[in-house]
Amino acid sequence: MNTILVTGGCGYIGAHTIVDLIENGFDVVSADNNSRSNENILNAVEKITGKTVKNYKVDLCIYDDTCAIFQENPDIVGIIHFAAYKAVGESVEKPLMYYENNLDSLINILKCADEFAIPNFVFSSSCTVYGNPDAIPVTEETPMKPAESAYGRTKQMGEKIVNDAVNANKNNAILLRYFNPVGAHPSTLMGEIPLGKPQNLVPAITQTAIGKLPVMKVWGNDYPTKDGSCVRDYIHVCDIAHAHTLALNYLLQNKNETNCDIFNLGTGDGLTVLEIINAFEKISGVKLNYEMGPRRSGDVIAIYANNDKAKKLLGWLPKYSLQHMMDTAWKWELKLKDDEKIYNHPGRDIN
């Protein structure tokens, strides 16, 4: 039996990845302390897959508690590590909290992987490691520039930590640098559940459209882009999820040529914030109430991916269009309005 540990399994990308893993024949256990997620999302996983997933509600920054997961699950053959704080703006305001949480948890998981002889590790990294690149699209060989936020620096440091660890203990790892995951599962049974005021663009759009937020801020209108707003590479969360399954199989089948490999996960299309708003308005039929604001600390000007390597080596091909991303995100927001009690969390109060 091939069991995969997914840390942060109750989170947005983690839960979608669990679904994809199960649909591809894996057994899964989750580790998530639910400080920024909701364990009820695993009920949606069960509805979609017919499988119950156990979640260990532990703080991965505590080594002994982390070890207990592996002691109870000796059949774990791989780890996908999502668990981390991820809000760029918050990381600028609270950098030490980000360094402590994101790096301590990573180190503990890697120590356990070594102690319990688990050779396959997939790390949830980010395009923030590139900083403000000199040229776009970025390839995996694009030099890292200084990250614009503490969050980005934890990902830069995290990549180096993983690389050093697997080269020292002769294990294998893949670093997945993904760009901007959006959308929801096509079943509309699961999607993103922001805590507090949303930090990411699409939840801010959908919450404004449905009336949870009175107005949405577009941060910056003076960037050197086609309309003055930031450029990003938006990709459907299910495409991101499937890439993790492919990466894991790549390691399990010993296809990797190095101990630590890197893949970009993006569509390759750079879109401005205003273009995303326009796409949402066309799909939903809702005119969005937004206003322009100043630049936000930590944001890069423009970034999007060259994804040729993932296509060639992993056999990964993004299949969801921008229209599908906006459509599923909006349908999920409409459903979430009805399911508010199910996903109630102190941080959901956005007033």
Sequence positions of predicted segments:
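N-terminal Rossmann/SDR dinucleotide-binding element
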Residues: M1-G78, K197
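Rossmann-fold NAD(P)-dependent oxidoreductase module
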Residues: H16, D20, C112, I161, ...
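Active-site beta-alpha loop architecture of Rossmann-like, nucleotide-cofactor-dependent enzymes
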Residues: S37, Y85-G89
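C-terminal substrate-binding subdomain of Rossmann-fold SDR/epimerase-dehydratase oxidoreductases
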Residues: V58, A204-N351
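Conserved cofactor-binding/catalytic machinery of classical short-chain dehydrogenase/reductase
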Residues: I62, D104-N108, N120, M157-G158, ...
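N-terminal Rossmann-like NAD(P) cofactor-binding module of classical short-chain dehydrogenase/reductase
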Residues: V77-I80, V122
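Conserved NAD(P)H cofactor-binding loop of Rossmann-fold oxidoreductase domains
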Residues: F82-K86, S125-S126
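Catalytic helix-loop patch of NAD(P)-dependent Rossmann-fold dehydrogenases
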Residues: E93-L96, E100, D104-K111, V129-L175, ...
